[in-house]
From Swiss-Prot:
It is an enzyme of class 3 (hydrolase). One of its GO terms (biological process) is nucleotide metabolic process. CDD domains: Maf (cd00555). Gene3D superfamilies: 3.90.950.10. Pfam families: Maf. SUPFAM superfamilies: ITPase-like (SSF52972). This is 7-methyl-GTP pyrophosphatase. The record marks Y14, Q76, E161 as: Important for substrate specificity. Its main location: cytoplasm. Nucleoside triphosphate pyrophosphatase that hydrolyzes 7-methyl-GTP (m(7)GTP). May have a dual role in cell division arrest and in preventing the incorporation of modified nucleotides into cellular nucleic acids. Keywords: Cytoplasm, Hydrolase, Nucleotide metabolism. It comes from Bartonella henselae (strain ATCC 49882 / DSM 28221 / CCUG 30454 / Houston 1). It catalyses: N(7)-methyl-GTP + H2O = N(7)-methyl-GMP + diphosphate + H(+).
Length: 198
């Protein structure tokens, strides 16, 4: 067994909810750094590799503060034709984002990393491909009025488990990858390391 204590290095309530529903016992400790500044120190511009870099950076940051624990780091990158998009800060930005995504296919790269004692044990990214149907500006306004600021927590300004499903005509990929935590591969690793019952 690697560790008795499991820590999620993410303040995302959605990720914590997924782990709780899967029956995991864990603590939540957010990474203490400016994500955009750390991103600048990365050696890659590749969106999928960047998601791994950021997931690892978060896990390492928390792991160095809690060396005995096994730390889960996560990150999700929205990739539209190689361009990286981050979370928006306002409903106005959300409207602009949906106008950009309208009628196009983008990818969500969700990475998960495991660290202990500041050392990487595992990191991997998984991708989902999202085909957004053509959206009128009026529909986007009505959609945003209904979902309000909830969607500001989502890099794609949609929550696939709610009304966000109406934005798409096709989705290829795992549900958990879209939510931002590749749960099945993570559980396989946790069983392999005898952190959870297997």
């Amino acid at each position: 067994m690697l560790a008795e204590t499991l820590i999620l290095a993410s303040l995302s309530s959605y990720r914590a909810q997924l782990l709780k529903k899967a029956g995991l016992n864990f603590f939540v400790k957010g990474a203490s750094f400016d994500e955009r500044e750390v991103e600048k120190t990365g050696k890659t511009k590749n969106p999928k590799e960047l998601s791994c870099f950021l997931a690892s950076a978060k896990a390492k940051n928390v792991s160095e503060r809690f060396p005995e624990a096994l730390v889960i780091g996560c990150d999700q990158i929205l990739d539209l034709e190689g361009q990286v998009f981050h979370k928006v800060k306002s409903i106005e930005e959300a409207h602009q984002r949906l106008c950009i995504l309208s009628g196009k296919i983008h990818s969500l790269h969700s990475a998960v990393a495991l660290f202990q004692n500041g050392q990487e044990i595992w990191v991997e990214a998984f991708s989902a491909h999202m085909s957004v149907r053509p959206l009128s500006s009026e529909f986007i306004e009505r959609y945003l009025a209904r979902v309000e600021t909830d969607i500001l927590n989502s890099v794609g300004v949609y929550q696939i488990e709610g009304e966000g499903i109406h934005l798409f005509e096709k989705i290829e990929g795992d549900f958990f990858t879209i939510i931002g935590l590749p749960l099945l591969p993570l559980l396989i690793k946790l069983r392999h390391f005898e952190v959870i019952d297997g």
